[in-house]
A protein has these predicted regions:
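Active-site beta-to-alpha loop of glycosyltransferases that engages the nucleotide-sugar donor
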Residues: 3-17, 33
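Short alpha-helix within the catalytic core of nucleotide-sugar-dependent glycosyltransferases
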Residues: 13-17, 39-43, 93-107
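Short, acidic, metal-binding catalytic loop of nucleotide-sugar glycosyltransferases
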Residues: 17-25
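Short beta-strand/loop segment that forms part of the nucleotide-sugar
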Residues: 25-33, 54-57
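Active-site-proximal specificity loops/subdomain of glycosyltransferases
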Residues: 39-83
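Catalytic-site signature of metal-activated, phosphate-bearing donor transferases
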Residues: 65-67, 94-288
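Short beta-strand-to-loop acidic/aromatic patch adjacent to the donor-nucleotide binding site
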Residues: 79-93
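Boundary detector for helix-to-coil junctions that initiate low-complexity/charged tails
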Residues: 272-368
């Protein structure tokens, strides 16, 4: 798993603990200039032999470059079967078994999987205690922090040439076949854990994008919008509007826009008690959903084989077309040669006819 972090001391330890318990073998983390204790937490996992830490104090929020670099380390140094491209506030949740089980069940023909995210809302009031015990109200349908459709996250089999796009939402430079959206994985997302944490994140990320003078306007547009709210003095109002108090909770539950979700809290409490956590499915039919998803994957694989057969047939037709084109070009050249010869012949006959007519005229007129 890759992690790009900056000042995430309130969550990064829980993130690494959780994913290691779920079957992740190794963590490659880039610490982008942290000064809040994040570096010390990461170094402890490095000393334990389950992580590699890269310190990067470079300017700009060049997420794609830094994550792609970690992916190459995972491919060449760790010989990883799969790489989860993760952020500190994201927890990959398997609906059945653990993460190792889910990734091991994906047929070899698929090289990447896109996973939906589910946002958890902040609590109104205090911020005492672990975030996973406080943030238990999940949106039934999530959008990002400025109201746009929440983009999925991507995990993939490492291969040469892969570039992880900004935000870890997609891949570039590869034709890895993607697993269709299934119901075996989701990402639990905790972007707003306190107002202080949220404000710090908005400022450091937004200013990081400002330092990227070659940045496309579409890259980081949501973070830049939040930075503008901060500079206009409206970020606190925005945060409070999303925080869940008793009234908002009651309305959200009645309208089915909010769900009480204690899965991560239960998992982490069990983990800290020394017991082996057991993943609780999101619904009693999770195993049936897994079978249904795997059936869909098999159907896609069959379709892929049919497409390959059609491509082979198309290549045969293309070869026939190429041969016919060559014959047509050859015939065209022959026609052009014949046309030129005919033109020369006609010109020659015209010259001979003109000469013969002149001689007759001279004889008739007595001229030579």
């Amino acid at each position: 798993m890759t992690l790009l972090v900056r000042n995430e001391a309130d969550i990064v330890e829980a993130n690494i603990e959780y994913h290691l318990a779920q079957g992740v073998d190794f963590v490659i983390a880039t610490d982008h200039g942290s000064n809040d204790g994040t570096s010390e937490i990461l170094r402890e996992y490095e000393r334990m032999g389950v992580a590699k830490v890269i310190r990067d104090d470079g300017e700009g929020h060049r997420q794609s470059d830094r994550v792609t670099r970690m992916v190459e380390i995972a491919r060449l140094g760790q010989h990883a079967d799969w790489v989860i491209n993760n952020d500190a506030d994201e927890f990959w949740w398997p609906l059945v078994g653990n993460l190792r089980d889910v990734f091991a069940s994906i047929p070899p023909c698929f090289g990447q999987i896109e996973v939906k995210r589910r946002n958890f809302r902040p609590r109104a009031g205090g911020s005492d205690g672990p975030f996973y015990s406080r943030l238990i109200y999940r949106e039934a349908s999530s959008s990002n922090l400025v109201g746009h459709a929440l983009e999925p996250k991507v995990a993939h089999r490492p291969c040469p040439g892969v570039v992880v796009a900004p935000g870890n939402h997609s891949l570039q430079g590869t034709e890895l076949l993607a697993v269709p959206a299934g119901e075996v994985l989701e990402v639990l997302h905790f972007p707003m854990r306190s107002h202080e944490q949220f404000e710090r994140k908005v400022v450091q990320t937004g200013e990081g994008y400002e330092q990227m003078h070659d940045r496309s306007p579409m890259v980081g547009r949501d973070q830049m919008a939040l930075l503008e709210l901060y500079r206009a003095g409206k970020l606190r109002q925005y945060y409070d509007g999303l925080a869940v108090d008793e009234g908002a909770l009651e309305r959200g539950l009645q309208m089915s826009t909010l769900v009480v979700d204690r899965r991560l809290d239960d998992f982490m409490r069990t983990l800290h008690s020394g017991e082996r956590p057991r993943v609780r499915p999101d619904a009693p039919f999770a195993r049936a959903l897994l079978r249904r998803t795997m059936d869909a994957l098999s159907e896609v694989e069959r379709n892929r084989e049919e497409i390959a057969a059609l491509r082979a047939e198309n290549e045969g037709l293309s070869a026939s077309l190429d041969e016919a084109t060559r014959k047509l070009e050859s015939t065209t050249r022959e026609l052009q040669s014949a046309s030129q010869a005919l033109h020369l012949l006609r010109t020659s006959r015209l010259v001979r006819s003109t000469t013969w007519a002149r001689r007759l005229y001279y004889r008739a007129s007595g001229r030579r």
